[in-house]
């Protein structure tokens, strides 16, 4: 009998459930927005793990390559709001270099630098470049919009937003309402599906 081998997507999902996810029957977790939720997702507990880095790099790189093929144009760089997007952007940059098609990384500050050039963005800088905004988890969309604003200040052309987890709490709809495309590797429902399966 053949045993099913976990795909990279399965492997990363299991790491997220194990290290980054808590859930409750009642909304007991307070989010950054002040709202209460049944779910607590701290993606950084997974994205900073050595075991997760190759999986993150591969999964996001594959999504970006699919987008490039669709548009017929290359993506120059990936990045998002520090700190959540940073390890994902670095993983993508490293993976892309290994495959001979480098995609650069950048990091968007939460506030512009208070001295010197007062920059919003560190790392890759090329006005007009096509970039993908990376997000670890999308809830209301507020932090993603802040990252987009910083990237626009740097002169980037935003192609799409690519998130690790969509909490399915209105963030996707808010970004779309503002005219931004978004896709996610996982949703909260994907994480809960693993939890339910483990409980069987």
Regions from the language model: what does each represent?
Residues 80-84, 109, 138-139:
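Active-site nucleophile and cofactor-binding loops and adjacent substrate-binding regions
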């Amino acid at each position: 009998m053949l045993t099913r081998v976990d795909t990279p997507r399965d492997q990363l999902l299991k790491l997220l459930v194990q290290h980054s996810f808590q859930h409750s029957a009642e909304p007991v977790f307070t989010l950054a927005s002040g709202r209460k939720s049944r779910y607590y997702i701290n993606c950084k507990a997974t994205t900073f793990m050595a075991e997760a880095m190759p999986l993150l790099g591969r999964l996001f790189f594959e999504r970006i390559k699919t987008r490039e093929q669709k548009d017929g144009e290359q993506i120059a760089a990936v990045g998002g709001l520090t700190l959540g997007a940073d390890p994902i952007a670095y993983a993508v940059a490293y993976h892309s270099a290994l495959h001979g098609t480098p995609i650069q990384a950048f990091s968007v500050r939460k506030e512009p630098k208070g001295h010197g050039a007062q920059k919003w963005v560190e790392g890759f800088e090329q006005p007009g470049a096509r970039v993908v905004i990376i997000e670890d988890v999308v809830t209301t969309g507020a932090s993603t919009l802040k990252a987009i604003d910083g990237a626009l200040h740097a002169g980037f052309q935003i192609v799409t937003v690519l998130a690790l987890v969509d909490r399915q709490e209105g963030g996707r709809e808010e970004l779309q309402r503002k005219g931004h495309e978004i896709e996610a590797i996982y949703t909260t429902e994907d994480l809960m599906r693993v939890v339910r399966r483990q409980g069987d």
